[in-house]
């Protein structure tokens, strides 16, 4: 049987010094034979999705200790992408994913922890912790802080979120009163922003991967029901410890759960719910850590056969994550995918022997269990707060209308093709991605002249100065993982295009990435990126670009001879932006750029450069 990793520092006479230090943390004689379980928290007062996590690590710790474990909590960093958006702060967002993954590895391996509970929530924290968990391959349970309630204002019948506040602020016709009302109402509570943005997408995907409990992705941060998820996570991690260290059960380990089939299930869910394009980046990175063969080719194949069964903000103003929960949450969507024959249900999860078993219990359509139905009736209270578990409001009924409700059956799908697609062509030889769920069908095929910008800052200035005209393809380059560096999100350019009335009249193409709050014909992750010699670095103003989503194509309509000459010029220039950028790149960012791969590889480090 595997021995507790912690025995390295707790057993034997020569570890007297280490035990003395453990005792100084509160451990007693009877604790040294127990599993030491690390709790990776991510509390910070900078991020609304994490502001309520301060005491939740200790809530989990108490449960661990009640059932025979020793809990030791530590904290990671957490960057708020919304606050970092639109300025050089966004250069640090994606690199923070690697820092978080490394920090968790450092703490767990330095202290020989036996298992791990990951308390994550927002955009890069869940992916970073997921990468670490799969790298370490010790028992793990994820439990996130939960989604924010959607906002409301007397000036609108629609629910609000962060993107609404950004769009209205850039609308010159909106009054100061309206802008202020949206600003004060868009983000009313603690939690991850209320639409199907990156944070909520990733927390939903941990359910599909099998590494978190049902409800993790959709139970509101403010709702009392979420407390039970934290308590159950504490008890569950000790069970998983016993199964691995006491029984050598491989299904108790993350790599035994997050197999290729599980990654396919997670991506199937992502496509069906129209999740953020960032999830592709993060799943590719996680698959590499898990040593699972899962790449853009697999994602492309899935995108061609998986329908869109759920549509949530920013793809529609009608529904937010709280509405997905009311319709049965992640397992409501998985249930419909299962009935459509699109899931591999033999895979295990941290809470069930198989996904099939979990669906029997947690799918609201196939189960008539009153407790289950009550759980999914948990709803918003509409009271601004930063406190977790502070309300117990319930909807009067569930939304199980699979014809016209939030979640649809295959027969009533929003679209028979899913919400994400991979495009290839001479402009993106290694691929690029688009959230088709947010693209109006009238522009699924689009051709127009390029309007080229060498940075996000230049693009924002150009859009606000009315340089961009209807029918153009806005190209923002040298914003990839290496070229940015850091692969900035382009939420402000897309929001400003909307505010200028160009949301359905222009396309946007970048080697950077997009916020989960992005909609419109926004194509990101162009690979290779400009800084790595990608064709996007050769585009000039006026060049015609053709985008064909049904055919999964994206092409620069130029003769090869012209491209060859431009490539020669770019080689001589060292693949640098044509115009100087007033951007300070620190040594920390340079170190990230030195090893960064393009988006088709998940923007992970090129470990081949590190040697054996």
Swiss-Prot record:
Its cofactor is [2Fe-2S] cluster; Mg(2+). The modification N6-carboxylysine is found at residue 124. PROSITE patterns: ILVD_EDD_1, ILVD_EDD_2. [2Fe-2S] cluster binds at residues 122, 193. GO terms for biological process: isoleucine biosynthetic process; L-valine biosynthetic process. The keyword Protease does not apply. This is Dihydroxy-acid dehydratase. It comes from Stenotrophomonas maltophilia (strain K279a).
């Amino acid at each position: 049987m595997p021995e507790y990793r912690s025995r390295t520092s707790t057993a034997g006479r020569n570890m007297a010094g280490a035990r003395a230090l453990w005792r100084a943390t509160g451990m007693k004689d009877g604790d040294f034979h127990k599993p030491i379980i690390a709790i990776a928290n991510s509390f910070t007062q900078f991020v609304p999705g994490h502001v309520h996590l301060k005491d939740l690590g200790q809530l989990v710790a108490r449960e661990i200790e009640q059932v025979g474990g020793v809990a030791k909590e530590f904290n990671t960093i957490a960057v708020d992408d919304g606050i970092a958006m639109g300025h050089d702060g966004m250069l640090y967002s994606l690199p923070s994913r690697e820092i978080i993954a490394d920090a968790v590895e450092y703490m767990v391996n330095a202290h020989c922890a036996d298992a791990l509970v990951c308390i994550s929530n927002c955009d890069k924290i869940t992916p970073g912790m997921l990468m670490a968990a799969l790298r370490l391959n010790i028992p793990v349970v994820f439990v996130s802080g939960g989604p924010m309630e959607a906002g409301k204002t007397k000036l609108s019948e629609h629910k609000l979120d962060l993107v609404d506040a950004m769009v209205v602020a850039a609308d010159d016709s909106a009054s100061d009163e309206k802008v202020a009302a949206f600003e004060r109402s868009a983000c009313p509570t603690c939690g991850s922003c209320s639409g199907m943005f990156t944070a909520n997408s990733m927390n939903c995907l941990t359910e599909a991967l099998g590494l978190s409990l049902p409800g993790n992705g959709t139970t509101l941060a403010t709702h009392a029901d979420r407390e039970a998820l934290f308590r159950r996570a504490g008890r569950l991690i000790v069970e998983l410890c016993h199964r691995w260290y006491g029984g050598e059960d491989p299904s108790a380990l993350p790599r035994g759960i997050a197999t290729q089939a599980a990654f396919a299930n997670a991506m199937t869910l992502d496509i069906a719910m129209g999740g953020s394009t960032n999830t592709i980046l993060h799943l590719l990175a996680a698959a590499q850590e898990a040593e699972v063969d899962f790449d853009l080719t697999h994602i492309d194949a899935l995108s061609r056969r998986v329908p869109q069964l759920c549509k949530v903000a920013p793809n529609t103003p009608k529904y937010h994550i709280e509405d997905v929960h009311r319709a049965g949450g992640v397992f409501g969507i998985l249930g419909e995918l299962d009935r459509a024959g699109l899931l591999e249900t033999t895979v295990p999860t941290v809470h069930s022997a198989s996904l099939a078993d979990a669906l029997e219990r947690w799918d609201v359509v196939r189960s008539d269990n009153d407790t289950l139905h009550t759980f999914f009736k948990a709803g918003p209270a509409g009271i601004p707060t930063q406190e977790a578990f502070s309300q117990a409001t319930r909807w009067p009924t569930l939304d199980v209308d699979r014809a016209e409700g939030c979640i649809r059956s295959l027969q009533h799908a929003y679209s028979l093709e899913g919400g994400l697609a991979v495009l290839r062509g001479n402009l993106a030889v290694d691929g690029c991605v688009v959230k088709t769920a947010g693209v109006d069908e009238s522009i699924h095929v689009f051709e127009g002249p390029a309007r080229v910008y060498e940075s996000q800052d230049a693009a924002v200035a150009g859009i606000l100065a009315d340089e961009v005209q209807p029918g153009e393809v806005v190209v923002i380059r040298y914003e990839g993982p290496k070229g940015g560096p850091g692969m900035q999100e382009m939420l402000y350019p897309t929001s400003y295009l909307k505010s200028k009335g160009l949301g359905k009249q222009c396309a946007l193409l970048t080697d950077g990435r997009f916020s989960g709050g992005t909609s419109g014909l926004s194509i990101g992750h162009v690979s290779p990126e400009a800084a790595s010699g990608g064709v996007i670095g050769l585009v000039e103003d006026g060049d015609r670009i053709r985008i064909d989503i049904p055919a999964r194509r994206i092409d620069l309509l130029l003769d090869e001879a012209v491209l060859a000459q431009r490539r020669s010029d770019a080689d001589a220039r060292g693949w640098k932006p044509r115009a100087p950028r007033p951007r300070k790149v620190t040594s920390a960012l340079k170190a990230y750029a030195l090893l960064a791969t393009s988006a088709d590889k998940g923007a992970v480090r090129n470990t081949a450069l590190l040697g054996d």
